[in-house]
Curated annotation (Swiss-Prot):
Database matches in HAMAP family: Lgt
Listed name of the protein: Phosphatidylglycerol--prolipoprotein diacylglyceryl transferase
PROSITE patterns for this protein: LGT (PS01311)
EC number: 2.5.1.145
Example of a GO MF term: phosphatidylglycerol-prolipoprotein diacylglyceryl transferase activity
Keywords on record: Cell inner membrane, Cell membrane, Membrane, Transferase, Transmembrane, Transmembrane helix
Listed GO CC annotations: plasma membrane
Organism in which the protein naturally occurs: Thermosynechococcus vestitus (strain NIES-2133 / IAM M-273 / BP-1)
Keyword set includes Metal-binding: no
Subcellular location: Cell inner membrane
Transmembrane segments: 16-36, 56-76, 92-112, 175-195, 204-224, 236-256
């Protein structure tokens, strides 16, 4: 029988140094992502140094965008606690905000550097989904982003302070962080396989597959969560996921059915 998951705490003590697991995992995801993207870039005849430069742009844009996205949809709380808006180390970022910020940064970078946006995006996409798989474990250490109550063998124990007020006596919940992390690993392996297939080399393919595959999993998992960002009765992440699936499907239809390239700054 699988034991219930339980976070050891949000911090890691190393002598006189205290690190927050959330921030540490983001840093690990960034460094692994840069390393992998540079390796993939060489296989697509893209200068790895340009990928390193792009990575700075992505980090500078994505992390603040992820935080602002989260704050915007939780403004009822943050307008009364403005001092907490910048306390990103405590958690509270939204991956869709990071993706949007990263896309804007990559669009500007590739335009300035006269690179193919889609070719660069295909190099970055596997690293992005792998980083998401790693980053989800930050939710585990923070005891956040969990799902509905459950008694399954792989249930997640949530401490009393983190439980919803209406479920204060309910201890175990779906480990949605684990579901999404495992799903993202599967998407990562799919993208790596596609990257090596000559028939799927059209620029934009991997980003479109990423948009569809990640969003399918996120739509389902979001339906289990207790803390979804909401706009009225709608779960924002599910709405964004449907839009991403539609855009990804359009992109693949254009590339492989119509045989047309996606609009780009520069022809690869």
């Amino acid at each position: 029988m699988i034991a219930a998951f339980q976070s050891p705490g949000a911090t890691l003590e190393l002598g006189f140094i205290t690190l927050r697991w959330y921030g540490l995992l983001i840093a690990v995801a960034v460094f692994i992502g840069i390393w992998l993207s540079q390796r993939l870039a060489r296989q697509r005849q893209i200068d790895p140094e340009q990928i390193a430069d792009l990575s700075i742009w992505l980090v500078v844009a994505a992390i603040p965008a992820a935080r602002l996205y989260y704050v915007a949809f939780n403004w009822g709380f943050y307008q009364k606690h403005l001092d907490q808006v910048v306390q990103i180390w405590k958690g509270g970022i939204a991956i869709h905000g990071a993706i949007l910020g990263g896309i804007v940064a990559m669009a500007i970078f590739t335009y300035v550097q006269r690179l193919s946006f889609w070719q660069v995006a295909d190099v970055v996409a596997p690293s992005l989904i792998l980083g998401q798989a790693i980053g989800r474990w930050g939710n585990f250490f923070n005891s956040e982003a969990f799902g509905a109550p459950t008694d399954l063998p792989w249930k997640l124990y949530i401490p009393v302070p983190q439980r919803p007020p209406e479920l204060i006596n309910t201890a175990y919940y779906h480990p949605t962080f684990l579901y999404e992390s495992l799903w993202n690993v599967g998407v990562f392996l799919l993208l790596l396989w596609l990257f090596r297939q000559p028939r799927y080399q059209k620029p934009g393919t991997l980003l479109m597959v990423y948009a569809i595959a990640y969003s399918l999993g996120r739509f389902w998992i979001e339906g289990l969560r207790m803390d979804s960002l909401m706009l009225g009765p709608l779960r924002i992440a599910q709405v964004v996921s449907l839009v991403a699936i539609a855009l990804g499907s359009w992109g693949l239809f254009r590339l492989y059915y119509q045989g047309k390239p996606l609009p780009d700054w520069q022809t690869p």
